[in-house]
Amino acid sequence: MKKFLILLAVTLLPLAGFAQASSGKVSKRKVASVISQYKNKAGVDVVDLGWLGTSLLKGLVRYSDADDEDTRQALMMMKGLKGISLMSYDESDPSLKARITSHLEKALKGAELLMEVKDEGDKVRIYGTSDEKSGKVRDVAVFAPSDGTFIFLSGSFNLEDISKIMDK
């Protein structure tokens, strides 16, 4: 399911350009605070890649097959990526899961909702800050409370580069 959510986030980024004028942005500080508060709790798994980690990830992608057109386009999309945070808390006890969900909802309150997907009662919400003038979306958060999954992509992403990948 986590792979699906990551793929969904990257797939749906082009649709952010259709969002209304920005009502608010995702607060990196609030998101980091929630992740920091719960990262050492039982049943909570956190992966945090900062600037250096994402640079290494880009290097691995570049090294894997630089002659491949898809790889080059993925690198173009990733050039604005500054950090990735993933928190999975689906295996935590129910009361902790409810607290984490509540804190994440509070941290995302007022942020621009780019998209909400409902599937068999499960919701996946994608937040971010879109700028129609520059054709970019910044600081994207993917939140699936029923699955206990939260993904935060820090950086600025060009919608045109993402659209090229999606057209294939």
Where are the regions a protein language model picked out?
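A short, solvent-exposed beta-edge/loop patch
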Residues: 127-159
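Early exported N-terminus immediately downstream of N-terminal targeting peptides
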Residues: 24-92, 97
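A recognition module on extended beta-rich or small alphabeta surfaces enriched in W/G with H and D/E
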Residues: 159-168
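A generic beta-sheet turn/junction motif
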Residues: 12, 119, 144-146
